[in-house]
């Protein structure tokens, strides 16, 4: 638990309620709750929704770090087109149908994403 809180940057907030945290910290808290049981798959529905650009980037860097550190596979559902540049496999869905399905050969680190 301590390692997870440290990884997520929540150590100093360990005794706070989520309502006492900023939007980005609340998002990290939600990620911590999802990771506490060491899942092999993490489903992320709009992980950057309602966050400003800097906090969005911080959350994506965090997800990238979790993937590398714990080997957690992630399925990210988003309307944020920039995120497709950091992922391995991209599926684009329109009107309930997959319109594109490809492997991203030119992945960009989350820290280098533009237009978040």
List each model region and its residues.
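ABC nucleotide-binding domain "signature" region
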Residues: 1-8
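Conserved ABC ATPase signature
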Residues: 17-21, 25-27
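Hydrophobic anchor residue at the start of the ABC signature
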Residues: 31
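A short, proline-enriched helix->beta-strand linker immediately N-terminal to the Walker B motif
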Residues: 36-40
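Catalytic Walker B motif of ABC-type/P-loop ATPase nucleotide-binding domains
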Residues: 42-45
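Helix N-cap at the start of a conserved alpha-helix in ABC-type nucleotide-binding domains
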Residues: 53-55
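Conserved catalytic loops of ABC-family nucleotide-binding domains
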Residues: 65-76, 84
């Amino acid at each position: 638990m301590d390692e997870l809180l440290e990884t997520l940057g929540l150590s100093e907030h360990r005794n706070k309620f989520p309502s006492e945290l900023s939007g980005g910290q609340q998002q990290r808290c939600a990620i911590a709750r999802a990771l506490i049981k060491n899942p092999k798959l993490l489903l992320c529905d709009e992980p950057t929704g309602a966050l400003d650009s800097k906090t969005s980037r911080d959350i994506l860097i965090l997800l990238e770090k979790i993937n590398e550190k714990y080997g957690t596979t992630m399925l990210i559902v988003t309307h944020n087109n920039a995120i497709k540049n950091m992922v391995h496999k991209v599926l684009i869905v329109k009107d309930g149908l997959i319109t594109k399905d490809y492997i991203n050969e030119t992945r960009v680190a989350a820290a280098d994403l533009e237009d978040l």
